[in-house]
């Protein structure tokens, strides 16, 4: 899924609507997504149905780009995530720059995104 975004940095967020920290960080993620056009935000829901996801997004008035269904939690297994939310920061070359398990505050997310973009500008020079 992430390979289609190669050439741009990617934030990959593993989440579920039943997860309180995931729910709290979603408005923060949406705001960051709107502020960072150069980063592709990908939201991989873990083991919920599309109906549940759509209902949650509509109820919370969230407009997220690239919401994926990971019905068998394959991504969580691949990154060996022990909890949700889990966020991966992937550079334009497809390499994971950092990994964070747990809720991200706006300040922490901004710091991770700045580091991701710094690695991007180093690649460009």
PLM ranges: what are they?
Residues 1-10:
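A short beta-strand-turn-helix
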Residues 3, 20, 30, 97:
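Nucleotide phosphate-binding site architecture
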Residues 11-12, 41, 87:
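Hydrophobic beta-strand anchors of alpha/beta hydrolase catalytic cores
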Residues 13-18:
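Aromatic-flanked redox-active Cys/Sec active sites in thiol-based oxidoreductases
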Residues 23-60, 71-77:
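Structural microenvironment flanking redox-active thiols in thiol-disulfide oxidoreductases
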Residues 39, 65-66:
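Short, conserved active-site loop motifs that form the nucleotide-linked donor/cofactor pocket
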Residues 56-63, 70-121, 125:
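Thiol/disulfide oxidoreductase modules built on the thioredoxin-like
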């Amino acid at each position: 899924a992430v390979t289609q975004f190669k050439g741009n940095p990617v934030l990959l967020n593993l989440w579920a609507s039943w997860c309180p920290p995931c729910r709290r960080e979603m408005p923060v993620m949406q705001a960051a997504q709107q502020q960072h056009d150069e980063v592709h935000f990908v939201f991989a829901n873990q083991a919920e149905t599309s109906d549940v996801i759509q209902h949650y997004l509509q109820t919370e008035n969230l407009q997220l780009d690239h919401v994926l269904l990971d019905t068998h939690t394959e991504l969580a297994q691949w990154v060996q995530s022990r909890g949700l939310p889990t966020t991966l920061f992937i550079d334009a070359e497809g390499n994971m720059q950092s990994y964070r398990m747990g809720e991200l505050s706006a300040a922490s997310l901004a710091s991770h995104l700045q580091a991701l973009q710094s690695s991007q500008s180093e690649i460009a020079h």
